[in-house]
């Protein structure tokens, strides 16, 4: 399990764009399960939508990408690198995410070849599928 302090040691993202609250499991150094607690105080609810707050789908995808980043950084060869979003395939949204929901984020690295990685990702709330996709990343060195 990784708390927010450990997550910040792995990911360069910070408020308001750090969208992973806790990592609850890491398997085989390539599969990560994490959570994002969605509260009524999220900045994006001010405009999306004031009378009908729904978490934007692109932010659900970003939370999944960040979870994938944590998975990629479990590989020693990737330490000091960042996974840049390079593409997405088969993305489907099945359920809205609203204040009070807890997103369960799952990412499994399915391919790692050179500087390119792919991850199969899935988000659920209380067992209901929210989103699934395959995300591609280009690994790059972090600036010093």
Swiss-Prot record:
EC number, as in UniProt: 4.2.1.59
UniProt-annotated catalytic positions: 48
Disulphide-bridged cysteine pairs: none
Protein name per Swiss-Prot or TrEMBL: 3-hydroxyacyl-[acyl-carrier-protein] dehydratase FabZ
SUPFAM superfamilies in alphabetical order: Thioesterase/thiol ester dehydrase-isomerase
A GO MF label: (3R)-hydroxyacyl-[acyl-carrier-protein] dehydratase activity
InterPro entries: FabA_FabZ (IPR013114), FabZ (IPR010084), HotDog_dom_sf (IPR029069)
GO cellular component: cytoplasm; membrane
Pfam family membership, one: FabA
Family: Belongs to the thioester dehydratase family. FabZ subfamily.
């Amino acid at each position: 399990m990784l708390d927010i302090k450990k997550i910040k040691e792995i990911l360069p993202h910070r408020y308001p764009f750090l969208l992973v609250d806790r990592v609850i499991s890491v398997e085989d150094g390539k599969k990560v399960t994490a959570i994002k607690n969605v509260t009524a105080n999220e900045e994006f609810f001010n405009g999306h939508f004031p009378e009908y707050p729904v978490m934007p789908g692109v932010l659900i995808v970003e939370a999944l990408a960040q979870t994938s980043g944590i998975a990629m950084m479990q590989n020693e060869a990737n330490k000091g690198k960042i996974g840049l979003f390079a593409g997405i395939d088969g993305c489907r949204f099945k359920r809205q995410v609203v204040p009070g929901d807890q997103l369960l984020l799952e990412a499994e690295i399915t391919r790692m070849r050179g500087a390119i990685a792919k991850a199969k990702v899935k988000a659920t709330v209380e067992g209901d599928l929210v989103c699934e996709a395959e995300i591609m990343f280009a690994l790059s060195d972090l600036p010093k």
